[in-house]
Amino acid sequence: MPELTSLAQYLLAITPAFLVCAALLLAVPRTAPRTVPLLRVFVHILFFVLARDAMTAHGYWQVAAGGLRFTAPPLVLLALGAMSLGLVASTCWLESEARRQIRWLGMRPVLSVLLGVVGAVLIIALATGLKALFGLPSLAPVAPSMLPLLLGFALAANCYEELLFRGLLQQQLRAWLPACRAALVSGLLFGLCHAFLATTVTQVGAPILVFTVIEGVVAGLVYCRAGLLGASLAHGLAIFALAAGWV
C-alpha cells in the first residue's frame, strides 16, 4: 500500500535522530541536580521538533501564512495519532520522577475542560483578528467527513506536545520561576521551537512565530489553572479549527 510505504519512509528518515536522542536519554541520569531533568526535557523536545519538521518534507502537512492543512492520507494520520499517544505513554514512563510533578487537572475535571475550550476560543479569536489585520487569506474548509479524523489527530498529537512543553518543561521551570512567568517562558520557547519551521522548512516567516507564541502562552496560562487536560484541549482544539479551515 502506498500509505504504508510513505509511513515507512518517514519513520526511516527520523530513525537516526531517534537513536541519538535515545542514546542521550540513556547517558543523562534521571535524577540528581535540578538542571539534569531539565536537560532530559530538552532532549525530548528536540526529537519532537525534528520529527514534526520531517512531516513537511514527506507531504504530511502544509503550512501557509493564513492556515495549515493536514495532507497525509487518512491511514497515515491515524498511525501518527496512535504514535503520538504511544510517545505520551513512553515519555511518562521514561520520566517517572518528573511525571509525579505534572499537574494533570485543575481543581475539577469539568472546570479543566471548560478552561481548555475557553483557551482554544481565545487562541482562535486572536488568530482571526491578526489575520484580518494583516490581510492573510484563509484556506477553504475541509470536507465534513474528514472532521472526526482531524479532531482525533489534533488532540492526540497536541497532547504529546503539551506534555513536553507544559507538563515537563513548564513544570520544571516552576522550581525557579513564579507560575505566570513559567507559562510565559514555556510559551516563548514553544514559539522559538517553530523558528526553523517558519524560516527554513516553509519560509512562511513571522506569521508562524506570532501564532505559536500566542498559542504557547495561552496554553501555558491554561495549564496553571486547568492542568495538562486543559492545556491539551486549548492547543488541540485551536489546531483542529485551523486545520479544518474555520479560521
What is the predicted function of each stretch?
Residues R30, R34, R40, R52, ...:
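Arginine residue identity/basic-tract feature
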